[in-house]
Amino acid sequence: MRPGLWETCFWLWGPLLWLSIGSSGNVPPTTQPKCTDFQSANLLRGTNLKVQFLLFTPSDPSCGQLVEEGSDIRSSEFNASLGTKVIIHGFRALGTKPSWIDKFISAVLRAADANVIAVDWVYGSTGVYYSAVENVVKLSLEISRFLSKLLELGVSESSIHIIGVSLGAHVGGMVGHFYKGQLGQITGLDPAGPEYTRASLEERLDAGDALFVEAIHTDTDNLGIRIPVGHVDYFVNGGQDQPGCPAFFHAGYNYLICDHMRAVHLYISALENTCPLMAFPCASYKAFLAGDCLDCFNPFLLSCPRIGLVERGGVMIEPLPKEVKVYLLTTSSAPYCVHHSLVEFYLKEKRKKDTSIEVTFLSNNVTSSVKITIPKQQLEGRGVMAHPNPQCQINQVKLKFQVSSRVWRKDRTPVVGTFCTAPLPVNDSKKTVCIPEPVRLQAGVPAFQDLKIACV
């Protein structure tokens, strides 16, 4: 190139090049923004793992600080003297940020003085579910390496609490497995079922993955795992068909995820409200509804487990039992909390047919009902029902003797008996309240009785 042409090009393009790259003396270097949000992905980008660790603190609960290396953590607002909550989302079909994550983080930080680490693996969880499953081991290793940096700063293993949603629950279990079960706690919010129901203990969440492991099951007949995987396993409303969720396909996407995501909303509600989501150990949901499991003595020595940021779920016995199924009922919307009651009806005389009685609690325009059945040639029938208000706020009970709709099976003979009720857990007979006089019930005709129970 001739010198004249070279000089011409230099003076024409040189200043533009200098302006585009900046100078070390006059232009300040660009800095990363303080707050970082979740990534977005799509099917065209595949499912390559691209993990972000976002730190949220009590001093700035809405700002996610990107922390990747040890130096990032040391220069952040991370407080090694506080407990650390690690939140791991699950499969993201559309590659979007979880809609619940901001509210979840805020609820945790309001309920606990802690560090919150949100694990953003949207890239690796997008597209095909089975591709996301293949990323679980690699993701678990990345999280484990990140936690090792926290341990170097003086964080104790026992102060780390992993909260995993769906597929994220099994990621948390694998991380706990890498730490030989010495992490403080793992909470699985409806742990994923597909590919994990028959998986080995090393591949899925189980009670050996942390000092305390709990799981909340809300969709065992579809996307959630149906087997117990922790020390305590909450089967909410039996673990499936949650109140308020659509029952038919025409509801579309909401039909698919409503039951599954109810575990997340229950946990948020438990953090935001004082009404306890208390559960009761029982062999089966059917037995629980039948009134066969009224306290928590076996195996918890009366300490009934509760959903939320309660130390070991409120279970303080040693050693901890494993894979204990506990059951609770809820309402159809937040705060979901109910007060469980035992309801009983004692016949004055035995009958030759089964006797069905509908029991309804009424208080402040809120009603709850349950049907109890007294088998033929027996005197007692019982069941468990749920009501949003405590018993002392229930004004009346409505009793209705139900008969068969089939003409040839109708029995119009009135029944006479005594109604009794008690709030769960029923630890002694002093809690039981009975209507003073026997009640005479005509077939199909409701009878209203006042309830007078003192608040304590």
Swiss-Prot record:
The entry's localization annotation reads: Secreted
Q: Which residues are glycosylated?
A: 365
- Annotated EC: 3.1.1.111
Q: Which reaction does it catalyse?
A: a 1,2-diacyl-sn-glycero-3-phospho-L-serine + H2O = a 2-acyl-sn-glycero-3-phospho-L-serine + a fatty acid + H(+); 1,2-di-(9Z)-octadecenoyl-sn-glycero-3-phospho-L-serine + H2O = 2-(9Z-octadecenoyl)-sn-glycero-3-phospho-L-serine + (9Z)-octadecenoate + H(+); 1-hexadecanoyl-2-(5Z,8Z,11Z,14Z-eicosatetraenoyl)-sn-glycero-3-phospho-L-serine + H2O = 2-(5Z,8Z,11Z,14Z)-eicosatetraenoyl-sn-glycero-3-phospho-L-serine + hexadecanoate + H(+); a 1-acyl-sn-glycero-3-phospho-L-serine + H2O = sn-glycero-3-phospho-L-serine + a fatty acid + H(+)
Single GO molecular function:
phospholipase A1 activity
Q: Name one GO biological process term.
A: lipid catabolic process
Q: Which residues form the signal peptide?
A: 1-25
Q: What are the positions of the active site?
A: 166, 190, 260
Q: Which InterPro entries match?
A: AB_hydrolase_fold (IPR029058), Lipase (IPR013818), Lipase_LIPH (IPR016272), Lipase_N (IPR033906), TAG_lipase (IPR000734)
* One GO CC term on file: acrosomal membrane
Disulfide-bonded cysteines: 245-258, 282-293, 296-304
What is its EC class?
A: hydrolase
Q: Which domain of life is it from?
A: Eukaryota
The keyword Ribonucleoprotein is assigned to this record? no
Q: Which UniProt keywords apply?
A: Disulfide bond, Glycoprotein, Hydrolase, Lipid degradation, Lipid metabolism, Secreted, Signal
Family annotation (PANTHER family):
LIPASE, PHOSPHOLIPASE A1 MEMBER A
Would you identify the family this protein belongs to, as annotated?
A: Belongs to the AB hydrolase superfamily. Lipase family.
Q: What does this protein do?
A: Hydrolyzes the ester bond of the acyl group attached at the sn-1 position of phosphatidylserines (phospholipase A1 activity) and 1-acyl-2-lysophosphatidylserines (lysophospholipase activity) in the pathway of phosphatidylserines acyl chain remodeling. Cleaves phosphatidylserines exposed on the outer leaflet of the plasma membrane of apoptotic cells producing 2-acyl-1-lysophosphatidylserines, which in turn enhance mast cell activation and histamine production.
Full protein name? Phospholipase A1 member A
Q: Which organism is it from?
A: Mus musculus
